[in-house]
Amino acid sequence: MELMFAEWEDGERFSFEDSDRFEEDSLCSFISEAESLCQNWRGWRKQSAGPNSPTGGGGGGGSGGTRTRDGLVIPLVELSAKQVAFHIPFEVVEKVYPPVPEQLQLRIAFWSFPENEEDIRLYSCLANGSADEFQRGDQLFRMRAVKDPLQIGFHLSATVVPPQMVPPKGAYNVAVMFDRCRVTSCSCTCGAGAKWCTHVVALCLFRIHNASAVCLRAPVSESLSRLQRDQLQKFAQYLISELPQQILPTAQRLLDELLSSQSTAINTVCGAPDPTAGPSASDQSTWYLDESTLTDNIKKTLHKFCGPSPVVFSDVNSMYLSSTEPPAAAEWACLLRPLRGREPEGVWNLLSIVREMFKRRDSNAAPLLEILTDQCLTYEQITGWWYSVRTSASHSSASGHTGRSNGQSEVAAHACASMCDEMVTLWRLAVLDPALSPQRRRELCAQLRQWQLKVIENVKRGQHKKTLERLFPGFRPAVEACYFNWEEAYPLPGVTYSGTDRKLALCWARALPARPGASRSGGLEESRPRPLPTEPAVRPKEPGAKRKGLGEGISSQRGPRRLSAEGGDKALHKMGPSGGKAKVLGGTGSGGKSSAGSGSKRRLSSEDSSLEPDLAEMSLDDSSLALGAEASTFGGFPESPPPCPSSVGSRGPSTFLPEPPDTYEEDAGVYFSEGPEPPTASADHPGLLPGEVCTRDDLPSTDDSGSGLHKTKEAAPAVGEEDDDYQAYYLNAQDGAGGEEEKAEGGTGEEHDLFAGLKPLEQESRMEVLFACAEALHAHGYSNEASRLTVELAQDLLANPPDLKVEPPPAKGKKNKVSTSRQTWVATNTLTKAAFLLTVLSERPEHHSLAFRVGMFALELQRPPASTKALEVKLAYQESEVAALLKKIPRGPSEMSTIRCRAEELREGTLCDYRPVLPLMLASFIFDVLCAPVVSLTGSRPPSRNWTNEMPGDEELGFEAAVAALGMKTTVSEAEHPLLCEGTRREKGDLALALMITYKDDQAKLKKILDKLLDRESQTHKPQTLSSFYSSSRPATANQRSPSKHGAPSAPGALQPLTSSSAGPAQPGNVAGAGPGPTEGFTEKNVPESSPHSPCEGLPPEAALTPRPEGKVPSRLALGSRGGYNGRGWGSPGRPKKKHTGMASIDSSAPETTSDSSPTLSRRPLRGGWAPTSWGRGQDSDSISSSSSDSLGSSSSSGSRRASASGGARAKTVDVGRCYKGRRPESHAPHVPNQPSEAAAHFYFELAKTVLIKAGGNSSTSIFTHPSSSGGHQGPHRNLHLCAFEIGLYALGLHNFVSPNWLSRTYSSHVSWITGQAMEIGSAALTILVECWDGHLTPPEVASLADRASRARDSNMVRAAAELALSCLPHAHALNPNEIQRALVQCKEQDNLMLEKACMAVEEAAKGGGVYPEVLFEVAHQWFWLYEETAGGSSTAREGATSCSGSGMRAAGEAGRGLPEGRGAPGTEPVTVAAAAVTAAATVVPVISVGSSLYPGPGLGHGHSPGLHPYTALQPHLPCSPQYLTHPAHPAHPMPHMPRPAVFPVPSSAYPQGVHPAFLGAQYPYSVTPPSLAATAVSFPVPSMAPITVHPYHTEPGLPLPTSVALSSVHPASTFPAIQGASLPALTTQPSPLVSGGFPPPEEETHSQPVNPHSLHHLHAAYRVGMLALEMLGRRAHNDHPNNFSRSPPYTDDVKWLLGLAAKLGVNYVHQFCVGAAKGVLSPFVLQEIVMETLQRLNPIHAHNHLRAPAFHQLVQRCQQAYMQYIHHRLIHLTPADYDDFVNAIRSARSAFCLTPMGMMQFNDILQNLKRSKQTKELWQRVSLEITTFSP
């Protein structure tokens, strides 16, 4: 992880190459744009370069000249010349020791050239924007292009001839001037824009590496001094004649001035300039900074940054084809990006150059920073962004954590704010330079104030709120650091500036008299105005350079050889052009205004107060990583005198309270208690470098020093008095109250207002001041001093840890929620300090142990959630930085034992007692130390790994500790702290990824990792996966009340928002007396009538009959029943589902606990569609399998017992916590900890893709694929691939959980990803899906996947695909016909048993409506095919299919066999008696299947008493396994009531126990009820039951009312009265005689060979499904479809085939078919064909009897009605072309009407109507002709 601290190690200083490049956009855009010549100052340091700067004490070595050759000792003269050359201006040497020998002059000049090529690289890169010129220069140097180098004194020149050019044309003359190991100017004739061109670089490199090859000469003035007068004249004349054109005019002008009688300057000043003699003593030795080019390049960079730019994405897939990230993830990335990736890259590289210059003590640091700052502030967009981000909601807790970041502009704004904060941080370090003079510090203070005002002024021109100005930290942290005096705070002899002896550069200028025009700082480097870049690089010395005297002796001539210091010309000349600095610095004088009226405090206006207490925190810059050197972020709320007023002591009590004062009371005492100082806020002030104290003389004078003192004293008592959020903004409440008035009276202008609350650094606590000193020393290269100080600070930090406890919130109430802003500040401050201490301490081996302790202390810091989003992200980032630093420190035995101890605590769970913020970074570090492989992914092992300190159990301990950390639950909810939850997830993801990669080959470990990561133990909302992949069974801890994806058990009695009491008014379908358990999740108001509360299995009969308004059945997708997936969910509220997906409802493995007394209503289908399975299996936060700690204290629910009692069977319960109608109040973020959320779903998807990439797979979801990075590797690692698949599936479950409309989606990139992975993985993935697709995928998605998988070559995969297809058939109503038919084909390809299961599943789904009739006819044909297969010879009676316990067929169709919805088992024909099971006493307890949904119940028009369902539902008591009634489905369309067959009981002894007669065929007698007996009532003993409504068989729809009969066990033979039109006497029939009176088998079946009972079952099933198809035809009958009256609609053949089937089964079946056909067939032609064919199949001799049979009569009537409708319909749309067809239809109609006695009369009426119609006479003539000629 790259470091971002201010004090980073040399090899790690951040430049662009290190930074995190998000989406690679910076790289792409910078490289692809042609005009970006400036390459962002990349390459300014050699990547491998160490700290070999020459500026260290003795100027480090880089040149060959410094080495001792062959062991020779360097002479003392050389050593002294070298030191003098580095430190002392040559003019001073001459002044002090007048006759300097020429040889010594040459040696000093020799050593004055810089020795380190890194400096050349740095300045070349600065000037050119990249290291390219340096590289080219290096090439020229190596190619020996530098010719004739000559050094004259301090002037170096040469000719550079690039090899490919002809010498005269391509030769460039280069000149370089230098002084004290710094190049002070350079020039070249090549005309390049930047002064540091390739040729200058080549010459400098030549001089550094081949110093001995350069010809050395003394300065020109030295040589001239040796000439005689005539020699001098000769020299001048020869010079003029050599270059007459260039020199002659200048020579004449100089002669004129010298000979003038006037007192010209040249005559009045002694001495003359010499460019080769080095600068004057008063000049600063400064590297030549090419300011104009640099400024232009900075402008270009900033312009490009501010302007709109195309967004370049490196991965099309991830950006465009995946869903957009949710707000929490987007905001996290937006806030983290400026901390990690540095943008704009160029400016950040310049800032890092400034930092490096500080370290080298290069005086260009401040000028460069000034150029940068000036340029940044000229762009209003930059200042606007900086201001808005630092005063924005994400930096205050008032945002409600709901802000959504909007893409690129938001990212740019945060990056910009981060960049500006870093600038302020660097200014703060600049003013804390220990060698800085007070005068210079005052100048900088004035400049910083000007800049702050400029920002505010820019902002005012924009649209920003003026009221937030004082919340904007801006330059305040740097301004506060100006009020500081090293001499008082931390004097270091020889380092800190002192008034008595000026140390820096040996201050030789003091030897000269002070010059009037000299710069004020008395020679201090930064204060000297810099020459403008426009000056000639090799310029004639201004007046004041070396001059040789004319005519005096040598000894006397040396003195006047330079201008005396009194000559002010030079100062004037240098000050003039560079006045830019001076004028700004002088602008505010000494900043006196700023302190006037420091008492003016203002209460924030109401709009500000809405920002809540922590706006103060806004000032924290997320990116200010200068560990404490960051902006002190706040200076302006409380008022304390900005300067240290003369009347205030150097360290007054701290009054600056960025947060409510009470929060700071412990600071000085707790943090670094030292000395008797009063409590101070320093610890919380992140930006303040500890400790600086101002003295009077280095502070700007103040206008009201008294008021400052008064304030300070007055404020101190207020600290800690009351917890009022508003105290954040003023020192105490009393001051705040009068703030407005004070402001009005005492404001002396805007600047005063802005800086009124400034808190001088010196007023911080002693330890804060010392931290500031340590940072400054480290930043400015004083590493020894910094190291000593940091040891003290580290020990103090460990001895006095900060107090981060949060007081419990007061009484309930939103406004009183506890503020954690103080703790947050303390935490971020502490981490900042810890990282700084780590950085400094780790540089020296003797401090490694202390550094390790500081790092562990920081990682173990327990903190509350941060008060703002920005701080939340920053804290997480800081932790990761500390962990990265800690990993680099070598560890000894004591450190390892500490780590083991922490790992043990993590494993045992004792480490975190209260943790909203989990110690995941600590766990990650422990895992890295104990378990990470010897060679890490980067190929290097941190020095941390010392094999001698390792112990055998370390790896296992590390693994268990890490896994335990993955399972930790946070105690905060996503709604309150979205970014904390996001950060926790990301840290868990990183840790889990490391674990999975490390243990990818160990399946047992992978299972443990996934169990914790996907939170399997808590059984809350988790997908049921890995059951087949990892064989071990999952613990069924259903009673763990963890509301979570990772929830910790909540306290008993805590009312969770998603639970509600069922004690309220019973909703329709609610069970009023079902016990005190929570009614699964909705508050009552959240249960609209539209939610299908139909009681389902498991409810007592009373519940099943609870009144419920008719017609409230919502549309198919809105229904639903179980969290997991209720098979019923799609079409009908009460359809049962297949066993293997199911709840314990009809699951034979859940015996006693799923009894009627279950208080948890665990099987009520409360909500739509199929809520995610993951939650459906008893895993909801309010899961019914909750224990007694549930929200309403329900007794230990049977759900828990069920879960544990069911052994291998999975406990699956309904999740009802979320309403799929989109009514969940917390649609985005849950208010309960550890709940699923949109952000969690997105995170887990990304994690799944990452795991897949690590496995070697390709995570692409589209055609834009990129080649896999794993070269010859064959496919992804299988175990990791499966892990990725499971994580993705879990994510999809979470996503569905929070997406109300997921069932209706048509495309999802997530789903396509999952199906793609399933195809790659093969059968293992499909097996997982068979178990748990229900909450994750929709049936069409599953069917599509199964279809794709069925084409694989692997037989296992094909088999798994068939299983998958079978698993989605119970939801056939959600599939289209092609999908269903393909699934049936897949099952058929496997074996007959699977085909049977498939057919039954489709049939069961169809009973609720929604399945196409064509599909059902296809199913019927499949049943018939099975019949033919089994009847065709191999009639093996499958015993498994006929026994209840073995349950081959039974188990397969358990959903159908469980008598759901009051019907008989699927094999039950409506005219047969439903299966009767024998109780121990052989009592007959039949199930009355009076109302099979084959005959749809009446709709709204029917006259039920409300709430009584038209069907009969009796509770069966079968001994083999408990079965439950379900509330039957309402038909999709209300229809007229249909006749129903009556049902007769059969003695149980007649059949094997629990088996339906339909299975048994002709071997057993079975009873049917012919229509003539329809009015007979049935009587038999019934156990005590609820009232039952019976609809007897009747012919006239709508006439009878159902009768409710209370059955009681007291009456052994209660009767069911049956009504047919009029009341008939009830016949009481005993069961036993009925058996003998049963009808014989149908005649078709009585051939010589006995029929296989199993094949007969298939035949019955084919008929049954065909009839269901007819019913479906009727349901869609009212559509105005062209096929309605077609002569041969598509279903004709199927209907006729069904008639043949009915005839095969017997007369009664034919009658039943007639009833169905009358309902389902609309075409009069088809109806007529059916009538005629039926008459043929029945005995034609008794045709009239048949016609009188009710069913047949109804069919004929329907046919006649259809003809009437047809004729009416055709008359409307009739054209002459249709006449023939119409006439034929009339003829057919006549034959139909002839079938009934009154038919012809009706037909004649039709003809009369036809005659009266408006049609033409021609039509009537043709019709009448046809009628007369047609004889029926």
From Swiss-Prot:
User: A GO molecular function for this record?
Assistant: ubiquitin-like ligase-substrate adaptor activity
- Which locations, inside or outside the cell, does it occupy? Cytoplasm, Cytosol
Specify residue ranges for compositional bias: Gly residues. 55-65, 1121-1132, 1455-1465
Phenotype reported upon loss of the gene: Zswim8-deletion embryos are smaller than their littermates and die near the time of birth. These mice fail to achieve proper oxygenation after birth.
At what positions is Phosphothreonine found?
1141
Coarse class of the primary localization is cytoplasm
- Transmembrane ranges? none
Q: Identify the keywords attached in UniProt to this record, alphabetized.
A: Cytoplasm, Metal-binding, Phosphoprotein, Ubl conjugation pathway, Zinc, Zinc-finger
Instruction: According to the UniProt record, list the residues that bear Phosphoserine.
Output: 36, 48, 53, 437, 564, 1155, 1158, 1162, 1270, 1831
Q: Which InterPro entries match?
A: Znf_SWIM (IPR007527), ZSWIM4-8_C (IPR048370)
Source domain of life: Eukaryota
What residue spans carry the region label Disordered? 45-67, 516-722, 800-821, 1018-1216, 1435-1465
Subunit info here reads:
Component of the SCF-like E3 ubiquitin-protein ligase complex which contains CUL3, RBX1, ELOB, ELOC and ZSWIM8. Interacts with DAB1.
The UniProt entry's sequence similarity note says: Belongs to the ZSWIM8 family.
Name the record gives this protein: Zinc finger SWIM domain-containing protein 8
User: Which organism is this protein's natural source?
Assistant: Mus musculus (Mouse)
The lineage, from the top, is: Eukaryota, Metazoa, Chordata, Craniata, Vertebrata
